[in-house]
């Protein structure tokens, strides 16, 4: 199990990827305590002085002008959590819940939320015990924060709701006991601090980012294999071509292709003196298209890395000045826009891959047997696999429609503009699944094409990619049940089997 000492506000993308991938044992850095305690003291002073402060001794949303009596403050926080736990849909998996919880711990621990260490420690104990609250997938519009998902997360702290432990659902009180905890009574401001924030939206988008990174790496490897299978040229990857344009993503992508393709191979030498002048765009323009995708990944990663370390609570407690300020950091518009940009990249990765599949199957373009199979007519080969790839790529065109431009007023028009960041993030997973399927078919097709080059080898790194597939899926010598081959290739890609072929430092979290 990964051990992490959390210094609030310093989580890296690599750490976030690791937290999403596997259980973690978390410890809060001792340096966090003074700021946390100071924010709590500030809230307590406001109550003692009987000052009005939103979320501490008032109602919420449109009810913000309703003053709450001191004897009702604890009940106010409990009622908030119970009433806001109104999500719907399938429960989030453990990996995503863990990431949401760590993001919330990270935010609360920065000391601007007025929440006691006791509550933060309880969340840490749940993470360390691998006790994951039941959080439904749907119910947040990404402003005012992710209220419903985070309310479901917080229910367990109160002894309400349920949690999953080692794959089994348990009542909250039993789940708390496993973590060595008892139900908490929330103090003033604490329920709101737990519920308000962009942590679910950010986790949704981070998962999409991590998946998109793996897809980018797989597409570079599969695209390189396709260049070789279709007897493409290495010239379009020449560094000089890309330096004069100056687009960093394009420059770095071309370098990745040069690293994978090498200077030459048996395949490239076999057509050294051919009369082809230029390759089709799906081969030749890979650095330009995939470079643009890499730029989107990097820009989204920057936004999400900042948001993962942000304080997105409301109101914020500035203990040094004794101020409590209502703002709008809960509005997840930056996350929604980042997710929209990731959607464009995921869609384009799949779209370009599908075109390379089609190219390889066309004997006039690739000089390979029609549909990548010998004895065509009797055998249909990759004919319908390409149709599947086309269907998946087309689905992603619709799914890539931006969500950040959508809004629907809530809370009686008090919350009159929202981000739709959760929807923007979660559709990335379906898009990634679609593009993974397209890339799996290209991987199969490119390796098939190379097999049909009668024993010629490609570069050392691309041979690794080829053998990674051939260790699971044999050559397609005659028609057979095709779907299992695609499923095996998809499974390999989902495990990141081709991600390690890229040079270090290209992708934001790797």
Swiss-Prot record:
Coiled coil: none annotated. It comes from the Bacteria. Pathway: Amino-acid degradation; L-histidine degradation into L-glutamate; N-formimidoyl-L-glutamate from L-histidine: step 1/3. It catalyses: L-histidine = trans-urocanate + NH4(+). It is an enzyme of class 4 (lyase). One of its GO terms (molecular function) is histidine ammonia-lyase activity. Its EC number is 4.3.1.3. PANTHER family: HISTIDINE AMMONIA-LYASE. This is Histidine ammonia-lyase. It comes from Pseudomonas putida (strain ATCC 47054 / DSM 6125 / CFBP 8728 / NCIMB 11950 / KT2440).
């Amino acid at each position: 199990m990964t051990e992490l000492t959390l210094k609030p506000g310093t989580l890296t993308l690599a750490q976030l990827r690791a937290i999403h991938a596997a259980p973690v044992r978390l410890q809060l850095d001792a340096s966090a305590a003074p700021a946390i305690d100071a924010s709590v003291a500030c809230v307590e002073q406001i109550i003692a002085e009987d000052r009005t402060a939103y979320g501490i001794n008032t109602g919420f949303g449109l009810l913000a002008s309703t003053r709450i009596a001191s004897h009702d403050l604890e009940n106010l926080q409990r009622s908030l959590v119970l009433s806001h736990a109104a999500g719907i849909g399938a429960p989030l998996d453990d990996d995503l819940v863990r990431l949401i919880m760590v993001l919330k711990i990270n935010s609360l621990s920065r000391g601007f939320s007025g929440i006691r260490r006791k509550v933060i420690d309880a969340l840490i104990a749940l993470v360390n015990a691998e006790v994951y609250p039941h959080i439904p997938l749907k119910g947040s519009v990404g402003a005012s924060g992710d209220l419903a998902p985070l309310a479901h997360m917080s229910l367990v702290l109160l002894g309400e709701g349920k949690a999953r432990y080692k794959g089994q659902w348990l009542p909250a009180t039993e789940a708390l006991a496993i973590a060595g905890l008892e139900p908490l009574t929330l103090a003033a401001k604490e329920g709101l601090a737990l519920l308000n924030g962009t942590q679910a939206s950010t986790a949704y988008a981070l998962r999409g980012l991590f998946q998109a990174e793996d897809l980018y790496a797989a597409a570079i490897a599969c695209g390189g294999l396709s260049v070789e299978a279709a007897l493409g040229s290495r010239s379009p990857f020449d560094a000089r071509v890309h330096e004069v344009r100056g687009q960093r993503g394009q420059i770095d992508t071309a370098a990745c292709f040069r690293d994978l393709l090498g200077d030459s191979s048996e395949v490239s030498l076999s057509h050294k003196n051919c009369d082809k002048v230029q390759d089709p765009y799906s081969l030749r323009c890979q650095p330009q298209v995939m470079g643009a995708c890499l730029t989107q990944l990097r820009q989204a990663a920057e936004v999400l890395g900042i948001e993962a370390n942000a304080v997105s609570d409301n109101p914020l407690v500035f203990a040094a000045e004794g101020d409590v300020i209502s703002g709008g950091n809960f509005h997840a518009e930056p996350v929604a826009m980042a997710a929209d940009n990731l959607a464009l990249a995921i869609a384009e990765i799949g779209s370009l891959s599908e075109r390379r599949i089609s190219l390889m199957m066309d004997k006039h373009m690739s000089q390979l047997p029609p549909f990548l199979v010998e004895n065509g007519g009797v055998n249909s080969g990759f004919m319908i696999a390409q149709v599947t790839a086309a269907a998946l790529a087309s689905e992603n065109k619709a799914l890539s429609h931006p969500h950040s431009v959508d809004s629907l007023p809530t809370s009686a028009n008090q919350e009159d503009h929202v981000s739709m960041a959760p929807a923007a993030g979660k559709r990335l997973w379906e898009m990634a699944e679609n593009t993974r399927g397209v890339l799996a078919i290209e991987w199969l097709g490119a390796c098939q094409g190379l097999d049909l080059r009668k024993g010629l080898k490609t570069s050392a790194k691309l041979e690794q990619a080829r053998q990674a597939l051939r260790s699971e899926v044999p050559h397609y010598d005659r028609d057979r049940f095709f779907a299992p081959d695609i499923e095996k290739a998809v499974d390999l890609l989902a495990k990141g089997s081709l991600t390690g072929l890229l040079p270090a430092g290209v992708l934001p979290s790797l």
